[in-house]
Amino acid sequence: MKLMRLSFTLFAALVFSTVHAQSQPDAKITSESYKDWTYNCLASSVEEQCEIVTKVVTNDGGTFAQLSFQITKDGQGPLFQIAVPTLVDLKKFVDLEVDKTPLAKFGYSFCNRQACFVAERPAVEFIDALKRGNELVMTLRSVVNGDITTKISLLGFTDAFARLEG
């Protein structure tokens, strides 16, 4: 439950960072591109919230999924999140593979009206596989469309993750 609250808080904070920044006059938003990954950071005199993110874009330009990593102050290691549309089969794991090698299967942590989320603290080996890889393949099951497989570029991930770690 604590991970779910933290995950939602971080996701919501970064999604609404512009609004948050406007309410904190000293807030500074930093965004840096690392090929297919982006480093975003909202810093104020009170706190700093940073993430790296990549989006899976549909043919019509919409966002199908978003993958992100955050380093949290609790010292428990990086928080990995996947946000996908609702109407996914919550009983089916999200399968991930890197360069055609199975990597991990993650269950959903929670859903809200906008999306369903995976929120995990992956092992170092998971992150190292992403750093060495070129392409991440994600498979999930929609209750409407069946299995959906999407490819996610890992170009720039290593540099973006290094930036996130500081």
Which residues fall in each region the model found?
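Positively charged n-region of N-terminal signal peptides that target proteins for export
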Residues: M1-R5
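Bacterial N-terminal signal peptides
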Residues: S7-T18
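A generic "folded-domain core" signal
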Residues: A21-G166
